[in-house]
Every structure is written in C-alpha cells, then in structure tokens.
C-alpha cells in the first residue's frame, strides 16, 4: 500500500522495484492505485483513510480468490500512510494475513488531522472551505471528518502475527515515534 498522494509505483518506483525482487524469488505481489490516485477512477478529494481501508480489504479478497495463491502465506506491505492503512487492514482481517511489513508507517497523518494539521501544513480552514490544499491537491472535508472517528493503533493492535517495521530516525514525513508505538502494541 502506497503513501499519501502517491501511486502504486511510489516515489522513485520503490514498490515496482520491490515487486521485481519478490518475483525473482518466486513471490507474487499485487500493486494497485487506491481510488482517486494514480490511474484509478475517482477524485483524490473524495479519498479518506476509511475508503483506503475498504479498498485494501477488497484487494485482500481479490488476492485470496486467485488459484495460485497459498492463502496461508498472504502478507501485506505498506509505506507511510499506506503503512497505517495496511496495519488497519491486517487488524481487521487477522485470520487472512500471515505477516505485515511496514516501512515508516504514518498513522500520525490521522492523529494530526484531528488537530487540523496535515503533514506539517495547517489546514484549519478545511471546514470553512470544504477542502484543504495540500501540495496542489485537494484533500476533502471527508478526510478530516473520517480522521476524527479513527484510532489506527487500536485497530492495528488486533493483528497478532509477525510484523516487520523499518523506519529511519531522520524521517521528516513520518515520525519514528509511530513505529515505536506500533512496536509497543
């Protein structure tokens, strides 16, 4: 699962490279664009964390339906906000996921949005305008309203299997404290 504002290939094609390396080792992978991002239909402005969790659950069901997939070996990988989404999908579907890989997970996107901050940008006018401008993209009011209702750590805590956390201590987008908190739960 990709980060906030990115597509299935991610910055510098990091997910495309990961998919190639997995394939070389005989491991199938699925990359996709969430609704409203990349080549997918929909508007970015309509995206919420909950809608991305729903997309993630649908992708998990799709992967489970593939004849060549060993259902006991399905793992989920997420980067940045995609790590937050991946952790929530894994928490909601613990029985269907054998492992979780999180690269610099960023549930702080959700928690900071409760204070009308988005990736370090003050979006306190989101209710007045109905959207926030973030690096030229419109983030809809629904994203803020959805964030008010979510507790990603509580959902992720329901996942009981292996988790691989990778996080740099100089990450300026996602605080290392996010991974430290995931480690605690």
Language model region names:
Residues 68-80:
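Alpha/beta-hydrolase fold nucleophile elbow
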Residues 46-67:
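Alpha/beta-hydrolase active-site loop
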Residues 78-88:
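Glycine-rich nucleophile elbow surrounding the catalytic serine of serine-hydrolase chemistry
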Residues 91, 95-185:
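The alpha/beta-hydrolase serine catalytic core
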Residues 1-4, 80, 168:
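Glycine-rich His-Gly loop
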Residues 22, 89-90:
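Aromatic pocket-lining residues of Rossmann-like dinucleotide-binding sites
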Residues 33-47:
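Glycine-rich "HGGG/HGxG" loop immediately N-terminal to the catalytic nucleophile
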Residues 1-33:
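Short, surface-exposed "cap/lid" segments of acyl-processing enzymes
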């Amino acid at each position: 699962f990709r980060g906030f504002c990115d597509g299935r290939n991610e910055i510098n094609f990091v997910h495309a490279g990961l998919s190639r390396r997995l394939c070389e080792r005989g491991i199938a992978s699925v990359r996709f664009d969430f609704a409203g991002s990349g080549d997918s239909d929909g508007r970015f402005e309509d995206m919420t964390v909950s809608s991305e969790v729903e997309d993630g659950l649908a992708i998990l069901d799709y992967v489970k339906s593939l004849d060549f997939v060993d259902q006991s070996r399905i793992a989920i990988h997420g980067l940045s906000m995609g790590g937050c989404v991946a952790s929530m999908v894994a928490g909601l579907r613990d029985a269907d996921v054998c492992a979780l890989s999180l690269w610099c997970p960023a549930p702080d996107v959700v928690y900071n949005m409760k204070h009308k901050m988005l990736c370090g940008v003050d979006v306190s006018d989101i209710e007045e305008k109905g959207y926030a401008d973030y690096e030229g993209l419109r983030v809809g009011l629904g994203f803020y309203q959805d964030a008010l209702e979510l507790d990603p750590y509580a959902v992720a805590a329901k996942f009981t299997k292996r988790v691989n956390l990778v996080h740099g201590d100089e990450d300026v987008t996602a605080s290392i404290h996010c991974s430290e908190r995931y480690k605690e739960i």
